[in-house]
UniProtKB/Swiss-Prot annotation:
The gene is cbiA. PROSITE patterns: GATASE_COBBQ (PS51274). This is Cobyrinate a,c-diamide synthase. The lineage of its organism: Archaea, Methanobacteriati, Thermoplasmatota, Thermoplasmata, Thermoplasmatales. The a and c carboxylates of cobyrinate are activated for nucleophilic attack via formation of a phosphorylated intermediate by ATP. CbiA catalyzes first the amidation of the c-carboxylate, and then that of the a-carboxylate. GO terms for biological process: cobalamin biosynthetic process. Its cofactor is Mg(2+). The active site is at residue 329. Disulfide bonds: none annotated. It comes from Picrophilus torridus (strain ATCC 700027 / DSM 9790 / JCM 10055 / NBRC 100828 / KAW 2/3). It is an enzyme of class 6 (ligase).
Length: 440
Protein backbone atom coordinates (compact mmCIF):
# COMPACT_ATOMS: atom_id res chain seq x y z
CA UNK A 1 0.00 0.00 0.00
CA UNK A 2 1.22 3.48 -0.83
CA UNK A 3 0.44 6.32 1.57
CA UNK A 4 1.35 9.91 0.79
CA UNK A 5 3.47 10.94 3.75
CA UNK A 6 6.18 13.25 5.02
CA UNK A 7 8.43 12.87 8.05
CA UNK A 8 9.60 16.13 9.59
CA UNK A 9 13.03 15.62 11.14
CA UNK A 10 15.83 17.83 12.41
CA UNK A 11 19.52 17.75 13.35
CA UNK A 12 18.58 18.13 17.04
CA UNK A 13 15.85 18.88 19.52
CA UNK A 14 14.80 22.54 19.82
CA UNK A 15 15.12 23.06 16.06
CA UNK A 16 11.44 23.94 15.72
CA UNK A 17 10.05 20.57 14.61
CA UNK A 18 6.86 20.80 16.64
CA UNK A 19 6.04 24.38 15.68
CA UNK A 20 6.74 23.80 11.99
CA UNK A 21 4.89 20.46 12.07
CA UNK A 22 1.68 21.81 13.60
CA UNK A 23 1.81 24.80 11.25
CA UNK A 24 2.09 22.50 8.23
CA UNK A 25 -0.65 20.25 9.60
CA UNK A 26 -3.09 23.12 10.09
CA UNK A 27 -2.20 24.80 6.77
CA UNK A 28 -2.69 21.55 4.83
CA UNK A 29 -5.89 20.79 6.77
CA UNK A 30 -7.42 23.85 5.16
CA UNK A 31 -7.48 21.94 1.86
CA UNK A 32 -6.75 18.25 2.62
CA UNK A 33 -7.55 15.52 5.14
CA UNK A 34 -4.37 15.32 7.21
CA UNK A 35 -3.51 12.41 9.51
CA UNK A 36 -0.90 13.35 12.15
CA UNK A 37 1.66 11.10 13.84
CA UNK A 38 4.44 11.51 16.39
CA UNK A 39 7.64 9.45 16.46
CA UNK A 40 8.48 8.22 19.94
CA UNK A 41 6.64 8.02 23.27
CA UNK A 42 5.67 11.69 23.67
CA UNK A 43 2.15 12.49 24.91
CA UNK A 44 2.23 16.31 24.67
CA UNK A 45 2.96 17.02 20.99
CA UNK A 46 0.08 14.80 19.79
CA UNK A 47 -2.33 17.08 21.66
CA UNK A 48 -1.27 19.95 19.40
CA UNK A 49 -1.59 17.67 16.37
CA UNK A 50 -5.19 16.88 17.37
CA UNK A 51 -6.10 20.57 17.47
CA UNK A 52 -4.21 21.36 14.25
CA UNK A 53 -5.91 18.65 12.17
CA UNK A 54 -9.12 17.66 13.94
CA UNK A 55 -7.86 14.05 13.93
CA UNK A 56 -6.24 12.09 16.75
CA UNK A 57 -2.47 11.66 16.46
CA UNK A 58 -0.90 8.23 16.93
CA UNK A 59 2.58 7.44 18.23
CA UNK A 60 4.99 5.54 15.98
CA UNK A 61 7.62 3.79 18.08
CA UNK A 62 9.65 0.79 16.97
CA UNK A 63 11.12 0.19 20.42
CA UNK A 64 7.80 0.09 22.28
CA UNK A 65 6.18 -2.15 19.67
CA UNK A 66 7.83 -3.50 16.50
CA UNK A 67 8.27 -2.42 12.91
CA UNK A 68 5.36 -4.60 11.77
CA UNK A 69 2.99 -3.30 14.45
CA UNK A 70 4.08 0.26 13.73
CA UNK A 71 3.36 -0.18 10.02
CA UNK A 72 -0.09 -1.57 10.83
CA UNK A 73 -0.87 1.42 13.08
CA UNK A 74 0.38 3.80 10.39
CA UNK A 75 -1.70 2.21 7.62
CA UNK A 76 -4.84 1.89 9.75
CA UNK A 77 -4.74 5.49 10.99
CA UNK A 78 -3.85 6.89 7.55
CA UNK A 79 -6.85 5.26 5.88
CA UNK A 80 -9.25 7.94 4.70
CA UNK A 81 -6.69 10.75 4.74
CA UNK A 82 -5.04 12.56 1.83
CA UNK A 83 -1.64 12.95 3.46
CA UNK A 84 0.08 11.79 6.64
CA UNK A 85 2.42 14.20 8.43
CA UNK A 86 4.80 12.58 10.91
CA UNK A 87 6.63 14.73 13.44
CA UNK A 88 10.02 13.25 14.32
CA UNK A 89 11.75 13.08 17.69
CA UNK A 90 15.05 14.63 18.84
CA UNK A 91 17.75 14.56 16.17
CA UNK A 92 17.17 12.52 13.02
CA UNK A 93 19.36 9.58 14.08
CA UNK A 94 18.83 9.76 17.85
CA UNK A 95 17.29 6.62 19.33
CA UNK A 96 17.66 4.37 22.34
CA UNK A 97 21.25 3.26 21.61
CA UNK A 98 24.44 5.13 20.62
CA UNK A 99 25.47 2.62 17.93
CA UNK A 100 22.01 1.90 16.46
CA UNK A 101 19.10 4.06 15.42
CA UNK A 102 16.38 1.90 17.01
CA UNK A 103 13.41 4.09 17.86
CA UNK A 104 14.78 7.03 15.89
CA UNK A 105 13.09 9.20 13.30
CA UNK A 106 15.46 7.71 10.71
CA UNK A 107 14.36 4.15 11.45
CA UNK A 108 10.70 5.13 11.20
CA UNK A 109 11.35 6.91 7.88
CA UNK A 110 13.11 3.85 6.43
CA UNK A 111 10.43 1.46 7.67
CA UNK A 112 7.55 3.55 6.30
CA UNK A 113 9.47 4.53 3.13
CA UNK A 114 8.54 8.15 3.78
CA UNK A 115 10.42 11.17 2.39
CA UNK A 116 12.11 13.30 5.06
CA UNK A 117 11.95 17.08 5.34
CA UNK A 118 14.66 18.52 7.59
CA UNK A 119 13.91 21.55 9.77
CA UNK A 120 17.14 23.34 10.66
CA UNK A 121 17.51 26.30 13.00
CA UNK A 122 19.78 28.76 11.18
CA UNK A 123 19.62 31.55 13.78
CA UNK A 124 23.36 31.31 14.44
CA UNK A 125 24.74 29.99 11.15
CA UNK A 126 24.83 30.40 7.40
CA UNK A 127 26.95 28.20 5.08
CA UNK A 128 27.55 25.68 7.87
CA UNK A 129 23.92 24.63 7.50
CA UNK A 130 24.91 22.96 4.22
CA UNK A 131 27.55 20.88 6.01
CA UNK A 132 24.99 19.72 8.56
CA UNK A 133 22.49 18.70 5.88
CA UNK A 134 25.26 16.97 3.93
CA UNK A 135 26.21 15.00 7.03
CA UNK A 136 22.63 13.89 7.60
CA UNK A 137 22.42 12.70 3.99
CA UNK A 138 25.70 10.75 4.14
CA UNK A 139 24.99 9.12 7.52
CA UNK A 140 22.48 6.73 5.94
CA UNK A 141 21.98 6.85 2.19
CA UNK A 142 18.94 4.57 2.48
CA UNK A 143 16.97 7.58 3.74
CA UNK A 144 15.21 9.81 1.25
CA UNK A 145 15.94 13.34 2.49
CA UNK A 146 13.87 15.31 0.02
CA UNK A 147 13.71 18.87 1.30
CA UNK A 148 14.83 21.40 3.89
CA UNK A 149 12.94 24.08 5.81
CA UNK A 150 15.06 26.86 7.27
CA UNK A 151 13.84 28.08 10.65
CA UNK A 152 14.59 31.17 12.74
CA UNK A 153 16.05 33.16 9.86
CA UNK A 154 16.94 36.77 10.59
CA UNK A 155 16.06 38.27 7.20
CA UNK A 156 15.31 37.55 3.55
CA UNK A 157 19.03 37.88 2.84
CA UNK A 158 19.81 35.31 5.53
CA UNK A 159 17.32 32.96 3.88
CA UNK A 160 18.90 33.55 0.49
CA UNK A 161 22.51 32.78 1.42
CA UNK A 162 21.65 29.64 3.38
CA UNK A 163 19.34 28.41 0.62
CA UNK A 164 22.10 28.92 -1.97
CA UNK A 165 24.68 27.03 0.12
CA UNK A 166 22.42 24.05 0.87
CA UNK A 167 21.20 23.63 -2.69
CA UNK A 168 24.73 24.00 -4.11
CA UNK A 169 26.44 21.46 -1.83
CA UNK A 170 23.65 18.92 -1.33
CA UNK A 171 21.34 19.18 -4.33
CA UNK A 172 18.40 19.08 -1.90
CA UNK A 173 15.76 21.80 -2.42
CA UNK A 174 15.05 24.31 0.33
CA UNK A 175 11.24 24.29 0.31
CA UNK A 176 10.77 27.05 2.85
CA UNK A 177 12.37 29.67 5.06
CA UNK A 178 10.60 30.75 8.25
CA UNK A 179 11.76 34.00 9.83
CA UNK A 180 11.81 34.39 13.59
CA UNK A 181 8.56 35.67 15.05
CA UNK A 182 6.89 35.83 18.45
CA UNK A 183 3.83 34.27 16.82
CA UNK A 184 5.79 31.03 16.44
CA UNK A 185 6.43 30.57 20.16
CA UNK A 186 4.68 27.86 22.15
CA UNK A 187 5.07 28.10 25.92
CA UNK A 188 6.96 25.32 27.65
CA UNK A 189 7.68 24.01 31.13
CA UNK A 190 9.75 21.35 32.87
CA UNK A 191 8.10 18.40 31.08
CA UNK A 192 8.31 20.07 27.67
CA UNK A 193 5.65 22.14 25.97
CA UNK A 194 2.55 23.22 27.83
CA UNK A 195 -0.22 20.77 27.02
CA UNK A 196 -2.54 21.77 24.21
CA UNK A 197 -5.53 21.71 26.58
CA UNK A 198 -4.18 24.30 29.04
CA UNK A 199 -4.80 27.29 26.81
CA UNK A 200 -6.99 28.14 23.85
CA UNK A 201 -4.42 27.09 21.27
CA UNK A 202 -6.54 26.96 18.11
CA UNK A 203 -6.01 30.66 17.39
CA UNK A 204 -2.29 30.37 18.07
CA UNK A 205 -2.02 27.42 15.70
CA UNK A 206 -3.89 29.40 13.03
CA UNK A 207 -1.28 32.18 13.29
CA UNK A 208 1.51 29.63 12.90
CA UNK A 209 -0.27 28.12 9.88
CA UNK A 210 -0.62 31.57 8.29
CA UNK A 211 3.16 32.05 8.58
CA UNK A 212 3.79 28.58 7.15
CA UNK A 213 1.54 29.29 4.15
CA UNK A 214 3.59 32.41 3.39
CA UNK A 215 6.97 30.79 4.04
CA UNK A 216 6.82 27.17 2.83
CA UNK A 217 6.08 25.78 -0.64
CA UNK A 218 3.22 23.51 0.42
CA UNK A 219 2.50 22.43 -3.16
CA UNK A 220 6.05 21.11 -3.42
CA UNK A 221 5.72 19.42 -0.03
CA UNK A 222 2.56 17.64 -1.23
CA UNK A 223 4.39 16.60 -4.41
CA UNK A 224 7.27 15.20 -2.33
CA UNK A 225 4.80 13.23 -0.17
CA UNK A 226 3.72 11.33 -3.28
CA UNK A 227 7.24 9.88 -3.55
CA UNK A 228 6.50 7.58 -0.59
CA UNK A 229 7.17 3.90 -1.22
CA UNK A 230 4.83 0.91 -0.99
CA UNK A 231 4.57 -0.74 2.43
CA UNK A 232 2.74 -3.75 3.86
CA UNK A 233 2.50 -5.41 7.26
CA UNK A 234 2.12 -8.89 8.77
CA UNK A 235 0.95 -7.94 12.24
CA UNK A 236 -2.78 -8.39 12.84
CA UNK A 237 -2.79 -6.06 15.84
CA UNK A 238 -6.30 -4.81 15.06
CA UNK A 239 -7.78 -8.05 13.75
CA UNK A 240 -9.44 -9.10 17.03
CA UNK A 241 -13.20 -9.05 17.50
CA UNK A 242 -15.24 -7.63 20.36
CA UNK A 243 -14.93 -9.73 23.51
CA UNK A 244 -17.33 -8.15 26.02
CA UNK A 245 -19.49 -5.05 26.07
CA UNK A 246 -18.38 -2.76 28.90
CA UNK A 247 -18.18 0.95 29.58
CA UNK A 248 -14.86 2.48 30.69
CA UNK A 249 -14.73 6.03 32.06
CA UNK A 250 -11.53 7.90 31.15
CA UNK A 251 -10.37 11.07 32.91
CA UNK A 252 -9.68 13.71 30.27
CA UNK A 253 -9.14 17.40 30.98
CA UNK A 254 -6.32 19.91 31.45
CA UNK A 255 -4.95 17.94 34.41
CA UNK A 256 -5.12 14.46 32.84
CA UNK A 257 -4.51 14.09 29.11
CA UNK A 258 -1.39 11.95 28.62
CA UNK A 259 -2.78 8.95 26.76
CA UNK A 260 -1.61 6.81 23.88
CA UNK A 261 -4.45 7.03 21.38
CA UNK A 262 -3.96 3.42 20.30
CA UNK A 263 -4.43 2.24 23.89
CA UNK A 264 -7.94 3.68 23.81
CA UNK A 265 -8.60 2.30 20.33
CA UNK A 266 -7.57 -1.19 21.46
CA UNK A 267 -9.96 -1.02 24.42
CA UNK A 268 -12.72 -0.18 21.93
CA UNK A 269 -11.64 -3.09 19.73
CA UNK A 270 -12.19 -5.50 22.63
CA UNK A 271 -15.67 -4.17 23.27
CA UNK A 272 -15.30 -1.11 25.49
CA UNK A 273 -17.50 1.94 25.11
CA UNK A 274 -15.43 4.95 26.18
CA UNK A 275 -16.97 7.81 28.15
CA UNK A 276 -14.94 10.79 29.32
CA UNK A 277 -15.12 12.80 32.52
CA UNK A 278 -13.18 15.62 34.17
CA UNK A 279 -11.83 15.35 37.74
CA UNK A 280 -11.44 19.13 37.55
CA UNK A 281 -14.90 20.12 36.38
CA UNK A 282 -17.35 17.25 36.93
CA UNK A 283 -19.03 16.41 40.22
CA UNK A 284 -20.07 12.86 39.40
CA UNK A 285 -18.55 9.92 37.57
CA UNK A 286 -20.46 8.69 34.53
CA UNK A 287 -21.99 5.23 34.80
CA UNK A 288 -19.15 2.82 34.04
CA UNK A 289 -17.74 -0.66 34.63
CA UNK A 290 -14.10 0.46 34.79
CA UNK A 291 -12.06 3.59 35.44
CA UNK A 292 -8.87 4.77 33.66
CA UNK A 293 -7.01 7.86 34.93
CA UNK A 294 -3.99 8.70 32.78
CA UNK A 295 -1.03 10.98 33.22
CA UNK A 296 -0.83 14.73 33.13
CA UNK A 297 -0.09 17.61 35.48
CA UNK A 298 -2.17 17.16 38.66
CA UNK A 299 0.43 19.23 40.52
CA UNK A 300 -0.53 22.30 38.48
CA UNK A 301 -4.20 21.88 39.37
CA UNK A 302 -3.75 20.49 42.86
CA UNK A 303 -5.97 23.03 44.61
CA UNK A 304 -8.89 22.55 42.22
CA UNK A 305 -8.55 18.77 42.31
CA UNK A 306 -8.38 18.84 46.10
CA UNK A 307 -11.45 21.07 46.38
CA UNK A 308 -13.62 18.85 44.17
CA UNK A 309 -14.82 16.69 47.08
CA UNK A 310 -17.79 15.35 45.17
CA UNK A 311 -15.84 13.64 42.38
CA UNK A 312 -13.27 12.30 44.88
CA UNK A 313 -16.11 10.77 46.91
CA UNK A 314 -17.58 9.24 43.75
CA UNK A 315 -14.20 7.74 42.80
CA UNK A 316 -13.79 6.25 46.29
CA UNK A 317 -17.28 4.72 46.11
CA UNK A 318 -16.48 3.36 42.65
CA UNK A 319 -13.30 1.73 43.99
CA UNK A 320 -15.06 0.33 47.06
CA UNK A 321 -17.68 -1.26 44.80
CA UNK A 322 -14.96 -3.59 43.50
CA UNK A 323 -14.93 -2.24 39.96
CA UNK A 324 -11.50 -2.00 38.24
CA UNK A 325 -9.46 1.20 38.55
CA UNK A 326 -6.32 1.73 36.42
CA UNK A 327 -4.09 4.80 36.79
CA UNK A 328 -0.82 5.98 35.26
CA UNK A 329 1.64 8.62 36.51
CA UNK A 330 -0.47 11.74 37.18
CA UNK A 331 -3.45 9.48 37.83
CA UNK A 332 -1.31 7.52 40.31
CA UNK A 333 -0.58 10.78 42.16
CA UNK A 334 -4.26 11.71 42.15
CA UNK A 335 -5.24 8.41 43.78
CA UNK A 336 -2.77 8.97 46.64
CA UNK A 337 -3.69 10.59 49.95
CA UNK A 338 -2.29 13.90 48.77
CA UNK A 339 0.37 15.93 46.95
CA UNK A 340 2.99 18.10 48.66
CA UNK A 341 3.98 21.15 46.61
CA UNK A 342 6.16 24.04 47.84
CA UNK A 343 5.36 23.37 51.48
CA UNK A 344 1.60 23.04 50.90
CA UNK A 345 -0.41 19.85 51.12
CA UNK A 346 -3.39 19.06 48.89
CA UNK A 347 -5.69 16.14 49.66
CA UNK A 348 -6.39 13.82 46.75
CA UNK A 349 -8.64 10.77 46.27
CA UNK A 350 -7.01 8.74 49.11
CA UNK A 351 -7.38 5.32 47.49
CA UNK A 352 -3.62 4.68 47.77
CA UNK A 353 -2.11 4.88 51.25
CA UNK A 354 0.80 7.13 50.36
CA UNK A 355 1.67 10.74 49.55
CA UNK A 356 3.35 12.22 46.50
CA UNK A 357 5.90 15.01 46.40
CA UNK A 358 8.00 16.77 43.76
CA UNK A 359 11.61 15.73 43.12
CA UNK A 360 14.11 15.33 40.26
CA UNK A 361 13.31 14.12 36.75
CA UNK A 362 12.92 10.43 35.96
CA UNK A 363 12.67 9.73 32.24
CA UNK A 364 13.05 6.84 29.84
CA UNK A 365 11.78 3.75 28.08
CA UNK A 366 10.94 0.83 30.35
CA UNK A 367 10.64 -2.94 30.07
CA UNK A 368 7.87 -3.77 32.54
CA UNK A 369 6.95 -7.11 34.12
CA UNK A 370 3.88 -7.75 36.26
CA UNK A 371 4.86 -9.12 39.66
CA UNK A 372 1.51 -10.89 40.16
CA UNK A 373 -1.95 -11.18 38.63
CA UNK A 374 -3.79 -7.86 38.38
CA UNK A 375 -6.68 -6.28 36.48
CA UNK A 376 -4.54 -5.74 33.34
CA UNK A 377 -1.85 -8.43 33.46
CA UNK A 378 -1.11 -11.94 34.63
CA UNK A 379 1.96 -12.36 36.78
CA UNK A 380 5.05 -12.59 34.57
CA UNK A 381 3.49 -10.79 31.59
CA UNK A 382 5.71 -8.21 29.95
CA UNK A 383 4.81 -4.85 28.41
CA UNK A 384 6.83 -1.90 27.20
CA UNK A 385 6.23 1.67 28.20
CA UNK A 386 7.62 5.02 29.18
CA UNK A 387 8.31 6.89 32.41
CA UNK A 388 8.35 10.70 32.57
CA UNK A 389 7.82 12.54 35.87
CA UNK A 390 9.27 14.76 38.57
CA UNK A 391 7.27 13.36 41.48
CA UNK A 392 7.68 10.45 43.88
CA UNK A 393 5.09 8.47 45.84
CA UNK A 394 6.10 7.01 49.21
CA UNK A 395 4.57 3.54 49.03
CA UNK A 396 5.89 -0.02 49.02
CA UNK A 397 5.65 -0.61 45.28
CA UNK A 398 4.48 -4.10 44.31
CA UNK A 399 2.86 -3.95 40.86
CA UNK A 400 5.66 -3.89 38.29
CA UNK A 401 9.32 -4.77 38.05
CA UNK A 402 11.42 -2.52 35.76
CA UNK A 403 15.11 -1.84 35.11
CA UNK A 404 14.91 0.86 37.80
CA UNK A 405 13.27 -1.41 40.36
CA UNK A 406 9.67 -1.92 41.52
CA UNK A 407 6.85 0.47 40.67
CA UNK A 408 3.19 0.89 41.39
CA UNK A 409 0.46 -0.59 43.53
CA UNK A 410 -1.67 -3.63 42.72
CA UNK A 411 -4.70 -4.82 44.69
CA UNK A 412 -7.75 -6.90 43.79
CA UNK A 413 -9.31 -4.14 41.66
CA UNK A 414 -6.58 -1.47 41.45
CA UNK A 415 -3.50 -1.13 39.26
CA UNK A 416 -1.65 2.18 39.49
CA UNK A 417 1.93 3.25 38.87
CA UNK A 418 4.25 5.73 37.20
CA UNK A 419 4.61 3.62 34.05
CA UNK A 420 2.74 4.67 30.92
CA UNK A 421 1.95 1.27 29.41
CA UNK A 422 1.89 0.92 25.63
CA UNK A 423 -0.87 -1.61 24.90
CA UNK A 424 0.24 -2.46 21.32
CA UNK A 425 3.39 -4.04 22.83
CA UNK A 426 1.15 -6.66 24.50
CA UNK A 427 -2.39 -6.82 23.06
CA UNK A 428 -3.48 -9.22 25.82
CA UNK A 429 -3.49 -6.27 28.25
CA UNK A 430 -6.47 -4.31 26.85
CA UNK A 431 -8.34 -7.59 26.41
CA UNK A 432 -7.75 -8.50 30.07
CA UNK A 433 -8.76 -5.02 31.25
CA UNK A 434 -12.06 -5.28 29.36
CA UNK A 435 -12.66 -8.77 30.80
CA UNK A 436 -11.89 -7.48 34.31
CA UNK A 437 -14.50 -4.75 33.83
CA UNK A 438 -17.02 -7.28 32.53
CA UNK A 439 -16.51 -9.84 35.30
CA UNK A 440 -17.22 -7.57 38.28
Amino acid sequence: MKINSIIIGAPSSSSGKTTISIGIMRALSRRLRVQPFKVGPDYIDPGYHNIATGRFSSNLDTWMSSREKMKEIFIKRSTGSDISIIEGVMGLYDGKQPDKDTGSTAEVARTLKSPVIIVIDISAMARTAAAIILGLIKMDKRLRISGVILNNAGSDYHCSIVRTAIEKYTGIPVIGCVKRSDDLKIDDRYLGLKTAMEDDNSGKIDKIADIIERSVDLDLLIKISKESGDISFKSGLFSKKNVNRVRIAIAYDAAFNFYYYDNIEMLKMYGAEIVYFSPLNDYKLPEADGLYIGGGFPELFAERLSDNYSIKKDIMEFFNSGRPVFAECGGYMYLSRGIKINGKYYEMASIINGESYMDSLILGYRNIRAESNNILMMGGWHVKGHEFHYSRLNVNANAYKTERGPDGISTKNLLAGYMHLYFPSNPRIPERFVRSCYNV
